[in-house]
UniProtKB/Swiss-Prot annotation:
<feature type="active site" description="Proton donor/acceptor">
    <location>
        <position position="102"/>
    </location>
</feature>
<feature type="active site" description="Schiff-base intermediate with acetaldehyde">
    <location>
        <position position="167"/>
    </location>
</feature>
<dbReference type="Pfam" id="PF01791">
    <property type="entry name" value="DeoC"/>
</dbReference>
<comment type="similarity">
    <text>Belongs to the DeoC/FbaB aldolase family. DeoC type 2 subfamily.</text>
</comment>
<feature type="active site" description="Proton donor/acceptor">
    <location>
        <position position="201"/>
    </location>
</feature>
<dbReference type="GO" id="GO:0006018">
    <property type="term" value="P:2-deoxyribose 1-phosphate catabolic process"/>
</dbReference>
<dbReference type="GO" id="GO:0016052">
    <property type="term" value="P:carbohydrate catabolic process"/>
</dbReference>
<dbReference type="InterPro" id="IPR013785">
    <property type="entry name" value="Aldolase_TIM"/>
</dbReference>
<dbReference type="GO" id="GO:0009264">
    <property type="term" value="P:deoxyribonucleotide catabolic process"/>
</dbReference>
<dbReference type="InterPro" id="IPR002915">
    <property type="entry name" value="DeoC/FbaB/LacD_aldolase"/>
</dbReference>
<dbReference type="InterPro" id="IPR011343">
    <property type="entry name" value="DeoC"/>
</dbReference>
<keyword id="KW-0704">Schiff base</keyword>
<dbReference type="GO" id="GO:0004139">
    <property type="term" value="F:deoxyribose-phosphate aldolase activity"/>
</dbReference>
<comment type="pathway">
    <text>Carbohydrate degradation; 2-deoxy-D-ribose 1-phosphate degradation; D-glyceraldehyde 3-phosphate and acetaldehyde from 2-deoxy-alpha-D-ribose 1-phosphate: step 2/2.</text>
</comment>
<protein>
    <recommendedName>
        <fullName>Deoxyribose-phosphate aldolase</fullName>
        <ecNumber>4.1.2.4</ecNumber>
    </recommendedName>
</protein>
<dbReference type="InterPro" id="IPR023649">
    <property type="entry name" value="DeoC_typeII"/>
</dbReference>
<comment type="function">
    <text>Catalyzes a reversible aldol reaction between acetaldehyde and D-glyceraldehyde 3-phosphate to generate 2-deoxy-D-ribose 5-phosphate.</text>
</comment>
Length: 259
């Protein structure tokens, strides 16, 4: 197996196959569930809006892939600093049956100098998730934070507040995951000594098998080749799947999605 084939198979099994569009429908989510079951293995999860969780759960069970996890988003995509709303949305997502919640960090508050609200918001959501055995990923929106110091700070605050994963981006801003921001965030995981318990998720902008290979190489360099399993690494993407499947000898690499 070539290096690109090997990394593509790894990446496919680490994907949170995503649809987070305003025009999402039950039919589109059902199609996403079908796509998550591939000829070479299943994606780790799907990521959808909360209202679609019940139909996704039913579809995944019916197609014989109940182990594909269901992730959803809260405080999304703007990362407002209203803790009560973020917590209410997170509790609602848990009630819908989410296995994982990707909450947006109040990044604009951090840019304005307020570190406390980010900690408090993540901690409140973490407490709700922990009580329900739900995984919490925190989206820090690196493309809006821009500066290394802010990316580092948001990562540190999120981890201290209990994040199970730190995630680069919503996919809804001009700049999403980059290798540079990925390295900074994974260096924080390393430097804080939390690589056993905290994972990393690049999202948005990882579109090709070659992109995925680059992002995995950074993880392998920092943590060794065994670290990036589905408990420690995910790709938030949709168009990536077609490229990975093409690299693995399935399909033409074309995707209907841009995330």
């Amino acid at each position: 197996m070539t290096d690109l084939k090997a990394s593509s198979l790894r990446a496919l099994k680490l994907m949170d196959l995503t649809t987070l569009n305003d025009d999402d429908t039950n039919e589109k989510v059902i199609a996403l569930c079908h796509q998550a079951k591939t000829p070479v293995g299943n994606t780790a999860a799907i990521c959808i809006y909360p209202r679609f969780i019940p139909i996704a759960r039913k579809t995944l069970k019916e197609q014989g892939t109940p182990d594909i996890r269901i992730a959803t988003v809260t405080n999304f995509p703007h990362g407002n600093d209203d803790i009560d709303i973020a917590l209410a949305e997170t509790r609602a997502a848990i009630a819908y049956g989410a296995d994982e919640v990707d909450v947006v960090f109040p990044y604009r508050a951090l840019i304005a100098g307020n570190e406390q609200v980010g900690f408090d918001l993540v901690k409140a959501c973490k407490d709700a998730c922990a009580a329900a055995n739900v995984l919490l990923k925190v989206i820090i929106e690196t493309g809006e934070l821009k500066e290394e110091a802010l990316i580092r700070k948001a990562s540190e605050i999120s981890i201290k507040a209990g994040a199970d994963f730190i995630k680069t981006s919503t996919g809804k801003v001009p700049v999403n995951a980059t290798p540079e921001s990925a390295r900074i965030m994974m260096e924080v995981i390393r430097d804080m000594g939390v690589s056993k318990t905290v994972g990393f998720k690049p999202a948005g902008g990882v579109r090709t098998a070659e992109d995925a290979q680059k992002f995995l190489a950074i993880a392998d360099e920092l943590f060794g080749a065994d670290w990036a399993d589905s408990r420690h690494y995910r790709f938030g993407a949709s168009s990536l799947l077609a490229s990975l499947l093409k690299a693995l000898g399935h399909g033409d690499g074309k995707s209907a999605s841009s995330y």
